[in-house]
């Protein structure tokens, strides 16, 4: 009987160890959690849709005056998820919220997609519908006591200009301070530093950032170099829909690498760059008395 019990204990112990190893192997290195909870933080969570209204009132604006609003869209991204433009800024906000002492507004997942709107699974919101909706969101954030409204934009094209325009309007009308960040442009130097070349839409930079968040969203087995096309120089040619779901900033550069180590390094460098910009801009706003 003792032998049976001993064998059973050994079996259970081994199974537990094996299960733990499997969990470690399958857990993405930078997988974001559903809630940014910290026992040592000012609040139970940094996410506005997860916090209770009474706790929100206790910290905004007395202790927290900054809010991060991730914006994106649904469109093709080579061999990564259609929602990469939402996945990236959402994860970014979760990574930097505490460092920048900010709350996180719910992600705005639909946007002005543009030339890739005809691909399967893509959505296109007109500027006429998008502009007033975004403006009311920013006005709502101002009404709730946020002084610094930071838009972490995950999608370029015409959406960037609209966000910048609306943010400027709300800043003037509501006497708040706004900042619009296109992370892939801001982190251009980091892209070249980590990957040794320029990036692209769904290129080495964006694919790497998503791979660092969740490798299961990346499908290298589906990848072919022929899936990529370099963006044309101004005035040369224009195609709608754009003929490839991977758009390279420079010809011959930016193809996805699928290198986990570089992806993790890039993820950290980009987050640091964005966080440092926000901290610096807010500090200088304060110094100027704006």
Residue locations for each model-derived region?
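Bacterial N-terminal signal peptides
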Residues: 6-16
